[in-house]
A protein has these predicted regions:
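Non-catalytic, polymerase-adjacent accessory regions of viral genome-replication enzymes
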Residues: 1-111
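Extended, charge-enriched "interface" segments that sit outside catalytic cores
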Residues: 20-21, 123-126
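Amphipathic alpha-helical blocks
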Residues: 105-124
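Conserved polymerase palm-domain catalytic core
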Residues: 116, 120, 135, 170-171, ...
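Short, solvent-exposed helix-loop connector elements
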Residues: 141, 245-250, 372-386, 397-409
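Nucleotide/phosphate-binding loop and acidic/charged catalytic motifs
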Residues: 156
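A conserved non-catalytic segment of reverse transcriptases
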Residues: 323-397
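Single conserved hydrophobic/aromatic residue that forms the stacking wall/gate
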Residues: 415-427
Length: 427
């Protein structure tokens, strides 16, 4: 526990007598800070990184008792707590309160928050339920935790991420450091572009992945403090002043939710390899089974439609069932590469033996609609205001698709934008 005297941190007392007895100097700092502004962030980052490297190494060596001890050491350190508070008070959601309406917007509030991040007696508040629009017109529910719960999740994420990164599937690309959708698409190109590459693709669609992951599976398999994890999973949510329980799924809207989902879905690549052979082995050449996943979207290639439907799909379904998940029968389909398929906003299709990747039709239409909505909303605005609204959307879409064959699509997009800007608007 951290000890304060008149707002000044004077020492740390460990609750674990095996790890420490009595008081000791905070190891991350040569001079303990006495305010938020006096924290040495270089020392904080160095301390956190050092412990994370040790956790990753222990995970690689499968020394799980050491992993647990190092995770406890990290989550009880002042450095990790300061890093967690900094993260939740500097990200985009820093001005969005939870059910308690509390924000940590001042240095004093951030400083006092350090003493509140402890597992003993911790009880998370219910999530504040809001809805955000989806491209198809429906709405997706999102839970907003309180600032304290966000910081606690950020704290435990520091200890969990080294484990998740060490055990992650090789071809998992979503919600991971230094990986992106462009990397996932590049791997698809590697798997499908050659003359003798697989020609059949299983497009996987998981029904409500984040909402349906089994709590029992998470509690049994996620390597972190089980009591804290259980409290997050069972916290429930508030909507229209009414409390609703949560019986399945990860705490959506929370910082730790994507990593929990990744941990649940990781392992499928190894299962596929055990059934159909590791990549670049004799067995894999016969089946041509390759796997690429970004968050809950994934594809699996295969040498034939029959292999994917009769052998691969049952393996995937069994893997998902263990985690409380099911595949959508209508959206999980097997497609020939000559017909093409959409993945992460791109369309991948072979034309006369050559694989071309370009923006998908749905993605383009969604983008054009967004531009049209901005123009219509700003029909009476000054030109500079409209430009300020349009530029981030135009540049964002162009940057996302800059790695693919998009010359024709970009030309069509420019024509549509010009037409929209020149057309008269009826008010």
């Amino acid at each position: 526990m951290y000890l304060f005297s008149e707002g000044r941190l004077i020492g740390i007392h460990s609750e674990d007598s095996k790890m420490s007895t009595g008081f000791k100097q905070v190891p991350a700092f040569s001079h303990p800070p006495d305010s938020w502004h006096t924290i040495n962030w270089s020392a904080v980052d160095r301390k956190v990184r050092g412990l994370q490297v040790r956790i990753a190494k222990a995970t690689r060596d499968q020394r799980w008792r050491k992993v647990k001890a190092l995770q406890r050491l990290l989550t009880h350190s002042l450095a990790a707590r300061a890093s967690a508070v900094r993260r939740v008070t500097e990200n985009r959601g820093k001005k969005t309160p939870g059910v308690d309406g509390e924000l940590w917007s001042t240095p004093q509030a951030k400083w006092l928050a350090l003493g509140r991040l402890k597992s003993k007696g911790y009880r998370p508040a219910p999530l504040r339920r809001v809805y955000i629009p989806k491209p198809d017109g429906s709405r997706r529910p999102l839970g907003i935790p309180t600032m304290r719960d966000r910081a606690m999740q950020a704290l435990y994420l520091l200890a969990l991420e080294p484990v998740s990164e060490t055990v992650a599937d090789r071809n998992s690309y979503g919600f991971r450091p230094w990986r992106s959708t462009a990397d996932a698409i590049e791997q698809c190109f590697v798997n499908l572009s050659r003359k003798h590459s697989a020609e059949w693709v299983l497009e996987g669609d998981i029904k409500g992945c984040f909402d349906n992951i089994s709590h029992d599976w998470l509690l049994a398999n996620v390597p972190m403090d089980k009591q804290v994890l259980k409290k997050w999973l069972k916290a429930g949510f508030m909507e229209s002043h009414r409390l609703y329980p949560t019986e399945a799924g990860t705490p959506q809207g929370g910082i730790i939710s994507p990593v929990l989902a990744n941990l649940a879905l990781d392992g499928l690549e190894k299962v596929l390899e055990s059934h159909f052979g590791k990549k670049n082995t004799k067995a894999s050449y016969k089946t041509k089974v390759n796997y690429v996943r970004y968050a809950d979207d994934f594809i699996i290639t295969g040498i034939s439609k029959e292999l994917l439907e009769n052998e691969v799909l049952p393996v995937v379904s069994a893997f998902m069932a263990e985690r409380g998940l099911t595949l959508s029968a209508s959206k999980t389909v097997v497609t020939h590469i000559a017909e093409g398929f959409d993945f992460l906003g791109q369309n991948l299709r072979k034309y006369n033996g050559k694989l071309l990747i370009k923006p998908s039709r749905k993605n383009l239409q969604r983008h054009l609609k967004k531009i049209k909505d901005i123009v219509r909303r700003n029909c009476m605005s000054r030109q500079d205001v409209l430009i300020h609204q349009l530029n981030p959307v135009l540049l964002g879409w162009a940057n996302y698709h800059r790695h693919v064959v998009a010359k024709e699509t970009f030309g069509y997009r420019s024509e549509e934008h010009t037409s929209e800007l020149q057309s008269p608007v009826t008010i």
